[in-house]
From Swiss-Prot:
This is Energy-coupling factor transporter ATP-binding protein EcfA1. ATP binds at residues 40-47. It comes from the Bacteria. InterPro entries: AAA+_ATPase, ABC_transporter-like_ATP-bd, ABC_transporter-like_CS, ABC_transpr_CbiO/EcfA_su, ECF_ABC_transporter_ATP-bd, EcfA_1, P-loop_NTPase. The gene is ecfA1. It is found in: Cell membrane.
Length: 282
């Protein structure tokens, strides 16, 4: 039996003055320790889901729906308990900075939890080191690059030891190299701390590395499954305005020409190896 750390059960949420729900009758589960990519076009409800998970928003009717995080059912009396379990890294890290230095910013969440200063200093130093920013501990966040700022934002979340990290379009403003560095960092942190990661993105290249993909369209769950189950559905993804990852685009073109590659070919390295093997047999 799987151990689900997050579950949505018939969740509907409508923003004030909106004529229609942002998410409608949404039900899904996320397994503990997994990496889940939540994909969809702009306005599909992705970021609304992240705010619902963290209790920043509440379902329209808690009597008809429920959100459970790490065994705690979200409600008015449990919202702070849930927020301690979930950390969000947003698209623009500048909106998250509150400290004059990197160390001050990472310490902010610990100060709110009244962590004793000697213990806090140790935690901050470790978190800053874990994200590769020890040399910038006394620097002003405003002087850092975009990738460095995201590292600091991740350190601030890591310091308070959540069970879940949500990346809410947090790599969308980075160049390809910076994006891959941040994703590699989060993968390492996930494994080292047995965290659950939710990546909210419209970048399917990023989503290709997830354990599970949830596809949202107009606030509803359109499909879900492993990347190798979702990405071959080229017409569905095109219909909702998403760009297919290169590997899957090429596999589709080859298939149309009678060359069918195995389902497990899901990244560039495997693709190149498979094509070399195919060429050697010709």
């Amino acid at each position: 039996m799987s151990d689900n750390i997050i579950s949505f059960d018939h969740v509907t949420f409508t923003y004030p003055d909106s004529p229609r729900p942002a998410v409608s009758d949404l039900s899904f589960a996320i397994e503990r320790g997994s990496w889940t990519a939540l994909i969809g076009h702009n306005g599909s409800g992705k970021s609304t889901v992240s705010k619902l998970i963290n209790g920043l928003l509440a379902p329209d009717d808690l009597d008809k729906s429920s959100i459970t995080v790490d065994g705690v059912k979200l409600g008015a009396d449990t919202v702070w308990e849930v927020r301690e379990k979930v950390g969000i890294v947003f698209q623009n890290p500048d909106n998250q900075f509150v400290g004059a230095t990197v160390s001050d910013d990472v310490a902010f969440g610990l100060e709110n939890r009244a962590v004793p200063r000697p213990e806090m200093l140790k935690i901050v130093a470790q978190a800053v080191a874990d994200v590769g920013m020890a040399d910038y501990a006394d620097s002003e966040p405003s002087n850092l690059s975009g990738g460095q700022k995201q590292r600091v934002a991740i350190a601030g979340i890591l310091a308070v030891k959540p069970q879940v990290i949500i990346l809410d379009e947090s790599t969308s403003m980075l160049d390809p190299e910076g994006k891959e560095q941040i994703l590699d960092l989060v993968r390492k942190i996930k494994e080292d701390n047995n965290l659950t990661v939710i990546s909210i993105t419209h970048d399917l290249e990023e989503a290709a590395g997830a354990d599970q993909v949830l596809v949202l369209d107009d606030g509803q769950l359109l499909d879900q499954g492993k990347p190798e189950e979702i990405f071959p559905k080229v017409e569905m993804l095109k219909r909702i305005g998403l760009d297919i990852p290169f590997v899957y685009r090429l596999k589709q073109l080859l298939k149309e020409r009678g060359i069918v590659l195995p389902d497990e070919i899901d990244d560039d390295e495997k693709l190149v190896q498979s094509l070399w093997q195919l060429n050697s047999k010709m």
